[in-house]
UniProtKB/Swiss-Prot annotation:
Top EC category: oxidoreductase
Name this protein carries in UniProt: Quinol oxidase subunit 2
Domain of life where this protein originates: Bacteria
Subcellular location as annotated: Cell membrane
Residues annotated as transmembrane: 49-69, 91-111
SUPFAM superfamilies, A to Z: Cupredoxins (SSF49503), Cytochrome c oxidase subunit II-like, transmembrane region (SSF81464)
One Pfam family here: COX2_TM
Length: 291
């Protein structure tokens, strides 16, 4: 009887816990608001994993409740002593196979989604991707457009409906590049170039941020990704090429020093005089100051 009362007391708290949970849902989470094929594939993976794990939890709690009620102590079985057993082959097979099946059910779609994210989205394989080098520094982001021969700091413009091949690297501590509505994060590391493919299906503004703590200015490492129509994107590129100042080596050396800066736009990029794969690029400011 006491066990039954305790169970119903716990059950009565369920509506309250749901209210508390839903209270944090007044604003849609960016991760659950996919705006591109990569983000959509990862969103589907999250939903599948959540549903599968919810089903498992539901089955466990149902079995737990049934066993508690059915095999609880009663006046008529106070003297019952269960027989001694040394194993149950069927049960041992079940509780070995079930976890294996669960892991397989989670692993297959996860592996497929992971490998798919390393390539141009299949919906856009016929479109040439725009290449953009992403460089993290303390505490800002630099975006270099090699073909367009321009560079921006702390903001990023891309054409909508076109795959973007990001080349991720760093001139400071390891960081992580993340635009939640367009896809998952990936690390930026010294002396390495990591590829990341993302795409925005339609024009809009998307928040990007650092997903790896990198010191006191970490909270300032946010940037805006604005997806434009192809016509507006081409117009913006042309305006930058014609009106923005050149990014000199001295100016670049100043930008990558630890500190917080605002938005900047240049009609050239630092890749013309710094090789991202070189040792010097790993800590550009350190090597420049030694000379």
């Amino acid at each position: 009887m006491q066990l039954k009362k305790a169970f119903w007391k716990l059950a009565s708290l369920l509506p309250l816990s749901l209210l508390l949970f839903l209270g944090g849902c007044d604003k849609k989470l960016a991760v659950l608001n996919p705006q591109g094929p990569v983000a959509k594939a990862q969103y589907d993976l999250i939903v599948w994993s959540f549903l599968l794990m919810s089903l498992i939890i539901a089955i466990v709690f149902i079995l737990f409740t049934v066993i508690l009620i059915r095999y609880r102590e009663k006046p008529e079985n106070m003297d019952y002593e269960p027989p001694e057993q040394h194993g149950n082959t069927l049960l041992e097979i079940i509780w070995t196979l079930v976890p294996v099946i669960i892991v397989i059910a989670l692993s297959i779609p996860t592996v497929k989604a992971t490998y798919a994210s390393e390539e141009v989205p299949k919906e856009s394989k016929h479109i040439k991707p725009v290449e953009i080098y992403v460089t993290s520094a303390n505490w800002k982001w630099l975006f270099s457009y090699p073909e367009e021969k321009i560079e921006t700091v702390n903001y990023l413009n891309i054409p909508a409906g076109v795959p973007i091949q990001f080349k991720l690297t760093s001139v400071g501590p390891m960081n992580a590049f993340w635009v939640p509505e367009l896809g998952g994060m990936k690390y930026t590391m010294d002396g390495m170039i990591m590829d990341l493919y993302l795409q925005a299906d339609k024009p809009g503004s998307y928040l990007g941020r650092s997903a790896n703590f990198s010191g006191e200015g970490f909270t300032h490492m946010e940037f805006e990704v604005e997806a434009k129509t192809k016509e507006k994107y081409d117009k913006w590129v042309k305006e930058v090429q014609e009106t923005a100042p050149k990014l000199t080596e001295a100016k670049y050396n100043e930008i990558v020093k630890p500190g917080v800066v605002g938005r900047m736009t240049f009609s050239s990029h630092h890749l013309s005089y710094v090789d991202p794969k070189s040792l010097e690029y790993c800590d550009y400011n350190y090597y420049k100051n030694k000379k």
